[in-house]
C-alpha cells in the first residue's frame, strides 16, 4: 500500500514537473516547423546560411585559417587568390 502511494505521488510530481518546465505553447513544435519551412523558402532569412566573409590575400588570418578566400594560410597570413 505504501509503495503504491509513493508511486502515485512520484508520477504526479513528474507529470507536474513536465508541464512546469515545458516550453510555452505559443512556441510549440508547429511554430518551429513553419519557421523552418519559411527559412527554406527564403534562404536570406536562414541563420545557418550566413557565413563570414573571407579574407583577401595578404590579410592576417589569425587562428581561423579557413576564413581565407584561398583556403591557404601560412604564418598567420592569407596567400594565393
Swiss-Prot record:
Record key words, sorted: Amidation, Cleavage on pair of basic residues, Disulfide bond, Hydroxylation, Ion channel impairing toxin, Knottin, Neurotoxin, Secreted, Signal, Toxin, Voltage-gated sodium channel impairing toxin
Record-annotated disulphide pairs: 54-69, 61-73, 68-78
Subcellular location: Secreted
Tissue: Expressed by the venom duct.
Any one of the GO CC terms: extracellular region
Effect of residue 59 to A: No loss of activity
GO molecular function: sodium channel inhibitor activity; toxin activity
Free-text description of this protein's post-translational modifications in UniProt: The difference between delta-conotoxin PVIA and [deamido]-delta-conotoxin PVIA lies in the state of amidation of Gly-80.
UniProt comment concerning the protein's domains: The presence of a 'disulfide through disulfide knot' structurally defines this protein as a knottin.
Protein name per the record: Delta-conotoxin PVIA
Amino acid at each position: 500500500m505504501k509503495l503504491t502511494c509513493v508511486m502515485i505521488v512520484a508520477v504526479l510530481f513528474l507529470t507536474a514537473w513536465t508541464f512546469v518546465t515545458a516550453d510555452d505553447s505559443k512556441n510549440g513544435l508547429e511554430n518551429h516547423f513553419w519557421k523552418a519551412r519559411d527559412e527554406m523558402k527564403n534562404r536570406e532569412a536562414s541563420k545557418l546560411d550566413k557565413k563570414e566573409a573571407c579574407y583577401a590575400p595578404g590579410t592576417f588570418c589569425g587562428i581561423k585559417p579557413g576564413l581565407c578566400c584561398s583556403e591557404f594560410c601560412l604564418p598567420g597570413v592569407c596567400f594565393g587568390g
